[in-house]
Amino acid sequence: MNNIWWQTKGQGNVHLVLLHGWGLNAEVWRCIDEELSSHFTLHLVDLPGFGRSRGFGAMSLADMAEVVLRQAPDKAIWLGWSLGGLVASQIALTHPERVQAIVTVASSPCFSARDEWPGIKPDVLAGFQQQLSDDFQRTVERFLALQTMGTETARQDARALKKTVLALPMPKVDVLNGGLEILKTVDLRQPLQNVSMPFLRLYGYLDGLVPRKVVPMLDKLWPHSESYIFAKAAHAPFISHPDEFCHLLVALKQRV
């Protein structure tokens, strides 16, 4: 069985695992890893099939979560950005004893728009899947541009994301397609009503992929969770607002 790429740094008494989003890899955290590793034992992970975690094909969300768990510390705060938020949520649902707290960043329990539920239109996700087969580098770049649109530092932030993608070999098309399939089909809104560990949800006010309208809806559905909106961020608040982002995580550490 293949192992995934996993790097541990820092000596904090609380473990923090960072899970990246679709099409990316753990290099995306380099803007905050020094700061966080001074407070936590930090675990940087390339999800199966992404970055340096080669030798994996497309996977279901449940299988992806199991592969990640194999190398994880016994207990940690799990932070997932975007698609990574679904992986962290899945782990909280199936292995709650391994999760000290869960943090989702610019993530939704249901990325796809449904009846009376704001999200990405399913035909947009299907379009991305179609375009992947035609020109996947350009498709990934378009997806990255969407993530930073509207922020004061949009161009700079998009460059940072693109650099992360290009730093390592591109994931295979079937892996990228599998990730989009998870975004298109998974719905964890009801199951996550039952988690009892501390649950922090972070959002960007300008996010074009996870509409801010979901925030009050989830506040109501999950009264045990807390939400925070970065007023001038889009889909990658840790890149546009690194200090504020780290401050929230250090504050969470005091509470777990």
Curated annotation (Swiss-Prot):
Any one Gene Ontology cellular component term annotated for this protein: cytoplasm
Annotated catalysed reactions: 6-carboxyhexanoyl-[ACP] methyl ester + H2O = 6-carboxyhexanoyl-[ACP] + methanol + H(+)
Catalytic residues of the enzyme: 82 (nucleophile), 207, 235
Occurrences of domain AB hydrolase-1 (ranges): 15-242
InterPro entries: AB_hydrolase_1, AB_hydrolase_fold, BioH, Carboxylesterase_BioH
A Gene Ontology BP annotation from the UniProt entry: biotin biosynthetic process
Binding site for substrate: 22, 82-83, 143-147, 235
Coiled-coil residues: none
Compartments, record wording: Cytoplasm
Name of the top EC class for this enzyme: hydrolase
SUPFAM superfamilies: alpha/beta-Hydrolases
Complex and partners: Monomer.
Biological role stated in the UniProt entry: The physiological role of BioH is to remove the methyl group introduced by BioC when the pimeloyl moiety is complete. It allows to synthesize pimeloyl-ACP via the fatty acid synthetic pathway through the hydrolysis of the ester bonds of pimeloyl-ACP esters.
Annotated family: Belongs to the AB hydrolase superfamily. Carboxylesterase BioH family.
Protein name: Pimeloyl-[acyl-carrier protein] methyl ester esterase
Source organism of the structure: Escherichia fergusonii (strain ATCC 35469 / DSM 13698 / CCUG 18766 / IAM 14443 / JCM 21226 / LMG 7866 / NBRC 102419 / NCTC 12128 / CDC 0568-73)
